[in-house]
């Protein structure tokens, strides 16, 4: 019995039609692991940073018609919310699991906060080749850093400073059948390895 990881059938919760039915499926197949991961990694980030981190599992409470196409747990050193701060995420779309760290468009002082990626641009470029960037957390599409030129990366970072909807996240993904999801041990190891890379950008 696994506690933290996700099986291929768990991703199928996003194929369930209708808001209520999909929420029921997410609550049964996905949220238990998000809650466990929330407990585990809020402690992990607290120990790694010396700040008290809190987990925020998506509730999708504002939805009244359209079922969610993704769900997540986010981590930030604020009990009341995470969107205003640079934050970490573990989440799922129907075809992949994602890990992310960065600045959301709702972020407070986001033009300043995103400069950490300018400051550590060489570190960003040297991340392993399966690392990605997401420029819109609401869309599943992500680009591999290795496929982007320095100019494209700089423009993506600058967009956060100049465009209201601008966002920048460094990311890493798994497909539902990847070996890293086969056991809790393998999955937790993958997540820690990834977050340790992301922590290089946390200040």
From Swiss-Prot:
This is UPF0637 protein SH1846. Gene3D superfamilies: Protein of unknown function DUF1054. Belongs to the UPF0637 family. InterPro entries: UPF0637 (IPR009403), UPF0637_domain_sf (IPR053707). It comes from Staphylococcus haemolyticus (strain JCSC1435).
